Amino acid sequence: MSIILSLETSCDESAAALVSNEKGKIDLLANEIASQIDEHANWGGVVPEIASRRHLENLPFLIEEVFAKSTLQIKDIDAVAATVTPGLAGSLLVGSITARTLANLHQIPFLGIHHLEGHLSSIYLSENHPKPPFLVLLVSGGHTELIKVDVKHKYQRLGRSHDDAAGEAFDKVARLLGLSYPGGPAIQKIAKSGDPKKFLFPKGRVSKPEGGFYPYDFSFSGLKTAVFRQIEKIRSENKKLPIEDIAASFEYIVAEVLVERSFKCALDQGLNSLVLVGGVAANVRLREMMLAKASKNSIDITLAPMEFCTDNAAMIGAAALLRLSSEGFKSSMELGVSARWPLEKSDSLYDPIPPF
């Protein structure tokens, strides 16, 4: 059995967790998160400098808390893991330096984890999870991707957003409607009392240079523009803005596009298992539409547990345990951080000569 202390500081959530594996099962021993949402809401989005400063303040207390709740001590852990890419560089540095310092002091391995691999690994924190190969729809504030997962951490990106990520579109449309940050929960709340078929917003497509469309790719910038124009039209007519209906119609079309292209990709690729992870995976309408579509197709659907959809350290620990237990992976103490790094190159985070 291995026990890992994991840290997550890629954006605006400071998090620490202790995870272990026994008999092939990942157990969460302790999990703590300090959210900065209220502070960043004053600015309408994440302020990188504020985020990194809060990580510096929060992380020591979170680490103390997970050890206190688990009754473990630092001498009991076998490795330390932290998110090193992608994310806000200043925020990533806080978690990475903390993890490497602890690993050096106690002479145990350090694992630098790709943030998206963490999201993919969140499904292993539930009782039932699929075995590779399977297709993942990873949908969050910064990413909207369709990823094929094969054995031994082999990833192939089959679809992506060419502009705004879905979560980013939620934030921008919420701002247009005068709703609070973050936009996802705000739109979901008000959309409950709206008509999702009131406005027929467009399903963005991405054109190929040679003609036609990329079948599994996404584009949400045109949808955002369509919402803006609809709002302007209604205001120009001096009518009351039907915020609930606009929110519901926007939420519905985003969910429909995500579901349609995910299932098309899975069926075309001959994959009978589809997984939904990421912050936007907490959206109730999206989860319901995924389950409804799955019931009409010969595809098994796995939804990330609600508590592990948004950024957390438990999923980083799960990813680290899978790396450590399968191949004995560990990262160089010289590994730095990077704001961007392809998931397909995540194996390079464990090279003797680090990629950054």
From Swiss-Prot:
Primary localization class, coarse: cytoplasm
UniProt remark on cofactor binding: Binds 1 Fe(2+) ion per subunit.
Keyword Disulfide bond: no
UniProt: substrate binding residues: 138-142, 171, 184, 283
Cofactor(s), by name: Fe(2+)
Enzymatic class: transferase
Record-stated family: Belongs to the KAE1 / TsaD family.
Protein purpose: Required for the formation of a threonylcarbamoyl group on adenosine at position 37 (t(6)A37) in tRNAs that read codons beginning with adenine. Is involved in the transfer of the threonylcarbamoyl moiety of threonylcarbamoyl-AMP (TC-AMP) to the N6 group of A37, together with TsaE and TsaB. TsaD likely plays a direct catalytic role in this reaction.
Protein name: tRNA N6-adenosine threonylcarbamoyltransferase
Species this chain originates from: Prochlorococcus marinus (strain NATL1A)
Organism placement in taxonomy: Bacteria, Bacillati, Cyanobacteriota, Cyanophyceae, Synechococcales
Encoding gene (name): tsaD
